Amino acid sequence: MKSSVSIATRTPARTATAFAPLGLTLVLALAGCSGDGTTFGDTNGAPTTGVYVIQNTAPPASGSVAKASATTTAATGTILQFSTSASGAATPVSTIANLNVTSLAYLAVDGTGDIYTTATEGTTGTSVLEFPVNSSNNAQPTRAIPFNTTTQISVPNGLAVDAAGDLALPEANSGIAIFASTANGSVAPTDYIAGGGASTLVNPTAAAVDTDDNLYIVNSGEDVTNPIVVFNTTSTGAPIRSIGGALTAMTVGSPQAIATDAAGNLYVANVVSGVSSILIFEPTATGNTPPLRDITGSNTLLGCVGGIALDNEGYLYVVSVPTCGSTASPTVLKFSTTGDGNIAPVATFTSATWTNADPTLSIAVY
């Protein structure tokens, strides 16, 4: 796998929905139509670059709104795209919507700007979906990998994509399913790193890949010593190194999301006892080594952080809510990748159309 940026998140304060297996039902349902049969002509008019987040809208509660409608409004999942220069109260520059799905989780982009997410259609199941760069409205996915016994995906804890479009999905309380960029439909993983044993994986909760084929995994659960383990393509199941210890400022369960830059530096969105920080480690970091930089403090405006992503212009983006467990609307905080200590973000934005992020506060940037 080759990549400079990968995103996958899970925040303990919010519980993600467990996804059921399915066949190809979802793929057919997404063939260019909204839930009410409406089609849109402009499905590839979005800007090439942007900041992507998820808005999951629940159906209206029983009451006047629901009773006023002749039809039942279903829950919907939408990908919102904002400008990388967004600030303040922002308006999306584009959306991927009308997908006939009830919820979305996790976001990632590959080297060409294609967008990846997992989508749930009611009770029929879930797939990993890829949308072309510039997708908008009810754009059709170019590929979909369903969750079933063949793909060995059931309840993923995240999603990482490298520059070529290879996928890595950490499975809850299990291992890592890896798919080649050509994988499509109900196919077996190209490779699978099994949990337990030599891999030391207990409950992998996030993933990222770098340009040197290193696969970073956040590992949690009982008997886990170091919260980050690193594999590469020559691994036979055992990690090549791990990162953890008092000097790292991480504890088991504290990393919420991870990402890498083109130089191979590792960025960790970290929460310890409700206090958030962004930790940056050098590419060769191993064992109980301190981070190169640690962005934390009141000036940062970090509340309880979730997803993290990087652009190619020297900025990192993190999603934050006021406190862990908060249902308040999320905020994107933008920092320089060279920032350190108690610094203010260079920009922040919220949006009136982004009020209910996915449980993992996912974000992707291209």
Identify the function of each model-found stretch:
Residues 3-22:
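Bacterial N-terminal signal peptides that target proteins for export
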Residues 28-32:
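C-terminal motif of bacterial Sec signal peptides marking the signal peptidase cleavage site
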Residues 35-366:
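Flexible "stalk/tail and boundary" regions
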